Regions:
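Short beta-strand/loop motif that positions the catalytic acidic residue
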Residues: 135, 141-143
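Gly/Ala-rich beta-loop-alpha elbow adjacent to hydrolase catalytic centers
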Residues: 68-77
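Conserved alpha/beta-hydrolase "acid-adjacent" motif
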Residues: 148-155
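Flexible "cap/lid" loop of the alpha/beta hydrolase fold
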Residues: 78, 82, 91-115
Length: 194
């Protein structure tokens, strides 16, 4: 099963419908034969761990899942993979959000009083570089192409260097970006997950 973890943060109302459904990702993956679950993240959660707990509660009982996370959803998905490694078979980090962006950090601080914990991390918010280097599951990284201020190429490159055995999937614009087309993403995901 593919579990899609949407992006977005506290500056705008983004849910699974806006991020995955409307752009055609969920339907496209199902048409390609994938079993797909796209839960909404816990919006305005005070920590990445709280988001991970929320996601864990949405996971079905049964076999391990493949987490496909977009943008800031990568931090929540990584926290889940670290907290419950027996539930996660592999991880796709698509369009990982660049940490240390002053504009985004200011928006988070304004919206969430506990922002310090949300902004902490190294390459990604909510996860230390040592935790990334300690991952022991298959990880694929899909960069934003072209890059933008929130999804920089350097973040994807740093993840590929830090995570043992991480592979790069072909990049594409992120949803709900107007240039996004679901077909390249669906092909990359179905090709990598088998």
């Amino acid at each position: 099963m593919l579990v899609l973890v949407h992006g977005g943060l506290w500056d705008e109302p983004v849910d699974a419908g806006v991020f995955w459904d409307r752009p055609g990702v969920t339907a496209g993956l199902r048409a390609a034969g994938a079993d797909v679950l796209a839960p909404d993240r816990a919006m305005r959660a005070g920590s990445w761990a709280a988001e991970a707990e929320h996601l864990a509660a949405a996971l079905p009982d049964g076999p391990q899942v493949v987490l496909v996370a977009g943008s800031n959803g990568c931090s929540a998905a990584l926290r889940l993979a670290l907290a419950a490694p027996g539930r996660v078979r592999s991880l796709v980090l698509a369009w990982p959000a660049t940490a240390g962006d002053e504009r985004l950090d200011a928006l988070i601080r304004a919206a969430v009083p506990e922002a310090a914990g949300l902004l902490a991390g190294g390459v990604l918010r909510g996860v230390t570089d040592a935790e990334l280097a300690g991952l022991r599951l298959p990880v694929a990284v899909l960069p934003a192409a072209p890059e933008n201020p929130v999804h920089r190429r350097r973040t994807a490159d740093a993840l590929l260097a830090l995570v043992p055995g991480a592979v790069e999937l072909p990049g594409c614009p992120e949803p709900p970006h107007p240039a996004f087309r679901p077909e390249p993403l669906i092909a990359a995901l179905t090709g990598w997950t088998g």
